[in-house]
Amino acid sequence: MGRDLDDVDRSILYLLQEDARGTSAKAMSDTIGVSASTIRNRIDQLEDDGIIRGYHPEIDYEAANIPLQVTFVISAPPTELQDYSEQIRGIQGVIDVREMLTGQRNIHVHVVGTDTNEITQITDAIHDTGAKIESSEVMRQRHVQPFNHFFLQGTEDMDARDDAVDKDDNSATE
């Protein structure tokens, strides 16, 4: 079981999900209201606890001239789920493998390729593992957003303070 996160941890996670590369500890400290060293220490602890497992770029595959993205839904025996998942992760062009907790359609695989020949090769490689492809869908677009449970703590208070400052500024000019 994981550990409980406080408001600072959740705020850090939210900001890192928005922009992990462009968000400095100083900028986060200004937004969250704690010191930059506290931010760095918390990030180190979140990494040590395995909550933050990495920092990954969001790639526009079409802009990288890899225009085809396909999602495969696969059935695998529950007792062999991890074995199939591991084999499939080793296939070139596979970028995401998700193991489902329930149901027969228990592996979802996201792949990319430059053309239908590459997608066919990936399909054949998946079949070679012994897994059964139940369906496949060509993906048009993928949208990712920060998990809203990791909302930025105190933003409501900061908005209220900004509104109060705006009112004070307006009353001073009247």
Q: What is each residue range found by the language model?
A:
Residues 1-174:
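A compositional/biophysical signature of low hydrophobicity enriched in polar/charged and small residues
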